[in-house]
């Protein structure tokens, strides 16, 4: 049994990250799922969706058949998100449903993903949810066959969560959810340590895949008829910075992916601090790199940005946005915004509203601040009432929706003009 430790998870070192290839499942584990149905329920971000594609493929190599409904599944695995309390509540609510099912028939229940990397979650699983059969984290998906095998053979709760990130494991099988659009991991982890964010603890230090492996994956997708790839990472703009002597960055990678012949390229998520002029040039000069930029601002207040540890100012963010809009025609700009961060004043919130007005985002993901155990922000005094936070969120959403409607109307007019042109010629 191995349980998570957030103190260890925070530590960073300069140890070289090894690349492990030729993933294999032991022959005796390839039969344990024969004639059994599995269901994987995924919560959270695109990284989790991509992880679930690996998990599903591993289970099918072990003989399991994909099911649709948890009511008739033999194995249910929850791939979880730790970014907000709401995600926690959904998962524990689902565990309650699964417990009820398990009381009437055999059922294997597993939990993985970012929640599994949290001490408080695993402690609760061990003490109050003993019906959960196995738990593993974000760093050891490739160990799923062995973990599941032990859980079945030993008939007791199997917990194997690595606090520290491991090697990069290539060649894990994948079951793509879409025949035309694909997720492609380019890196794992994050070293930014924003004060409110649990991700650097749950996903580990930044580790970039080698360009050769990324480009090979994209080329295979092109050959298989895929039309669109989304390059994934917690902070894709920092790609390559973790590899010593690696003179190759996100702009270089975007340029090379564009040359593979894939028709459409997206990337998420970008941190404003690492967005370079070279990246802007590559997006501008390559038509198959879509002019879609997700650029989380989180707050428009310099005071709050500093408390968040975001490492940029309102002014530098706006300078970047203006540069993007000047260089990339028809850019679609989206963002993330948190309201109700500890001790956010009316003035701070008004700064956020004003940056929305200046940027005119096409869309935004907006949230009330959710404290995460183990992060610095969770220890900050919070004197803002829930009523105030909810009122601010509604006011922000009204403004965001106003600019979203403007964006939709512009798009509609362009489509009508294009349709009229095509009809004439």
Identify what each model region corresponds to.
Residues 106-111, 118-120, 223-349, 357:
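Conserved SAM/AdoMet-binding glycine-rich loop
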Residues 378-381:
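Anionic-ligand binding region
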Residues 1-239, 315-326, 350, 354-358, ...:
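Proteins enriched for Cys/Gly/acidic motifs involved in redox and nucleic-acid/cofactor modification
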